[in-house]
Regions:
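Active-site pocket-lining/capping segments in soluble small-molecule metabolic enzymes
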Residues: 128, 133-134, 138-145, 151-162, ...
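Flexible, glycine/charged-enriched surface loops at secondary-structure junctions
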Residues: 221-226, 398-402
Length: 426
């Protein structure tokens, strides 16, 4: 026995390190088995709360749609025009995608909602047999320099590609989404810029309330019976306005609720504080969605606050711009240091890209503008985002979320700490 050891009071065993990696596609239906809801499955809109964390608001659910279940928390890749650029539908599933987001504004102008309807809806059009969601495109319209007029009944604007005059209303958005045919339809809302003052935020919030009431009264008339419709809560980072708006929408005929108007230029701490304060107040029996957030830190904050769904263009847009995201940090693959680096992007990553291709090869493809680069880089980035979320989903269901969340916080710290090995590589 070692000198000084006490056999009656042995030192406690160190806590095992939490599992921070997983296959995000594990447990999901294979691509070949995706398709319309089976007769014995719950009706679209049914939400099963499978587990809730005792130390935070984090939860894991199963949302049923007309094209099968969505296991939450869930990250949704953005396929604005009906495709995630460069990636085949079956490849989306292979890296862990469950539900794809498209944009009703863009699809309404090109190729047009009736054209999408003619071929059988968005699922047949893009050959994606799993769940799909469409955003109204209101955010894109309000971002246009050619915006002509906003009033309480809708928005007049000129299209971004040919300058033709157009109008968007709560009714026109639902009519387009009925033709496009997603499983989840987002209503028209007014999203003000992040730097807006309180008066402007309230004006946008009140207008969104009027549009939400109109959409809720029309949805049963316009949308198909198995399409879900989500309301959108505005209010910026003003917690009083957010609470007020949530209360005004909670009783309307919606199948789920989203927090809009975040990640639009406001300080990140204010955004996270808004998530922490408001997400747990959203109806417990309906899915909770935060629109347009997508850094690893944002997703960790959202899941801890009880959010079920989120989307962002970061995985695909950053990939196209040469940014590869991993548990080690973010790589600028154009950097000359990767010219002779034959390691995978992340040796601990099990994605199809890291299993086969090196940093040097990906750099070579990117420098020469080879389309294969976009495909591979997007697949890798999506895998990271899905894995980051799936690890937390598994932990909530296992009951060890606190330990896993703490482990992921350490990962974030290691990725950003100056002088660290990870930071030196990226």
């Amino acid at each position: 026995m070692a000198v000084g050891a006490d056999p009656w009071h042995p030192s406690p065993m160190p806590e095992p390190e939490p599992e921070l990696r997983c296959d995000p596609a594990e447990g999901l239906r294979p691509f070949a088995e995706l398709g319309p809801r089976r007769a014995d499955e719950p009706r679209p809109g049914s939400l099963e709360i499978l587990a809730e964390d005792l130390a935070s608001a984090a939860r894991s659910c199963r949302l049923w749609t007309a094209h099968g279940p969505v296991e939450t928390p869930c990250f949704m890749p953005v396929g604005t025009y009906g495709a995630v650029k460069g990636v085949l539908p079956e490849e989306l599933r292979a890296v862990g995608s469950q539900i794809v987001l498209a944009n009703a504004y863009h699809l309404s102008h090109r190729p047009g909602p009736e054209r999408v309807r003619e071929v059988g809806g968005i699922h047949a059009f893009m050959r994606w047999p799993g769940p799909a969601l469409t955003d109204s495109g209101g955010y894109q319209v309000f971002s246009l320099r050619s915006l002509q007029k906003i009033d309480d009944s809708g928005v007049d604007y000129r299209t971004h590609f040919d300058g033709a005059p157009a109008r968007m209303t709560p009714r026109s958005v639902l009519e387009a989404e009925a033709a496009i045919g997603p499983d989840i339809c987002m209503i028209l809302d007014h999203c003000p810029p992040g730097e807006s003052d309180r008066a402007a935020v309230r004006e946008a919030m009140d207008r969104t309330t009027r549009w939400a009431r109109e959409a809720a009264s029309l949805r049963r008339e316009i949308l198909h019976e198995d399409q879900l419709c989500f309301g959108i809560v505005q209010g910026g980072t003003d917690l009083d306005l957010r609470r007020e708006h949530l209360e005004s929408l909670a009783g309307l005929d919606f199948d789920g609720f989203a927090l809009g108007g975040l990640s639009v230029g406001e300080p990140v701490p204010a955004m996270h504080a808004t998530l922490e304060a408001i997400a747990p107040l959203m109806p417990r029996d309906k899915p909770r969605y935060v629109m347009g957030i997508g850094t690893a830190a944002d997703l960790l904050a959202a899941i801890r606050a009880g959010v079920d769904m989120f989307d962002c263009v970061i995985p695909s847009r950053h990939a196209r711009n040469g940014q590869l995201i991993s548990f080690l940090g973010r790589f600028n693959i154009r950097n000359g240091r990767f010219r002779r680096d034959d390691r995978p992007v992340d040796p601990g990553c099990a994605c199809p890209v890291c299993a086969r291709f090196s940093r040097s090869y990906l750099r070579h493809l990117h420098v020469h503008n080879d389309p294969l680069y976009v495909r591979l880089a997007t697949m890798h980035n999506l895998y990271f985002f899905h894995e980051w979320v799936a690890v937390q989903r598994r932990a909530i269901r296992r009951g060890d979320y606190a330990a896993v969340a703490a482990g992921l916080e350490k990962v974030l710290g290691a990725r950003t700490q100056p002088g660290s090995a990870a930071a030196a590589e990226v």
